[in-house]
């Protein structure tokens, strides 16, 4: 029986991009951070689930902070220094993700809230009664 060839893994090259955009999507269940260049090509990404948080711990501000630090560290390896931040979603990890990106060492030029607001579109889900 012939031996299967091992898949070749290419080493990621350093991209040398100075400025970019951090897209922070904070839902009720998770927080996802994607750092892209000005054209929208993803450079680095991370999420609370990818950092090992499971279940309701994914929606905590601390999980968002850990995910933002990880994505920021990956983007710094590509030479990124300045960020514009686009925040969307109603979750609890919005502010802590911003603070974590600032703590990594990025200079933040602008913060935009891109949360979609309906002009009376779809019917919302039923209200929670606790």
From Swiss-Prot:
Keyword rRNA-binding belongs to the record: yes
GO terms assigned for molecular function: rRNA binding; structural constituent of ribosome
- List, alphabetically, the InterPro entries matched: Ribosomal_uS11 (IPR001971), Ribosomal_uS11_bac-type (IPR019981), Ribosomal_uS11_CS (IPR018102), Ribosomal_uS11_sf (IPR036967)
Q: Name one Pfam family in it.
A: Ribosomal_S11
Q: Which GO terms describe its biological process?
A: translation
Can the keyword Isomerase be found in this entry's annotation? Answer: no
The UniProt keyword set, sorted, is: Ribonucleoprotein, Ribosomal protein, RNA-binding, rRNA-binding
> SUPFAM superfamilies this protein is in?
Translational machinery components
Q: GO CC annotation: what is one?
A: ribosome
Family stated for the protein in its record:
Belongs to the universal ribosomal protein uS11 family.
NCBIfam families under this entry?
PRK05309.1, uS11_bact
Assembly, per entry = Part of the 30S ribosomal subunit. Interacts with proteins S7 and S18. Binds to IF-3.
* Family annotation (HAMAP family): Ribosomal_uS11 (MF_01310)
Function, as annotated, reads:
Located on the platform of the 30S subunit, it bridges several disparate RNA helices of the 16S rRNA. Forms part of the Shine-Dalgarno cleft in the 70S ribosome.
PANTHER family in alphabetical order: 40S RIBOSOMAL PROTEIN S14/30S RIBOSOMAL PROTEIN S11
Question: What name does the UniProt record give this protein?
Answer: Small ribosomal subunit protein uS11
User: Which species is this UniProt entry from?
Assistant: Gluconacetobacter diazotrophicus (strain ATCC 49037 / DSM 5601 / CCUG 37298 / CIP 103539 / LMG 7603 / PAl5)
Q: Which gene encodes it?
A: rpsK
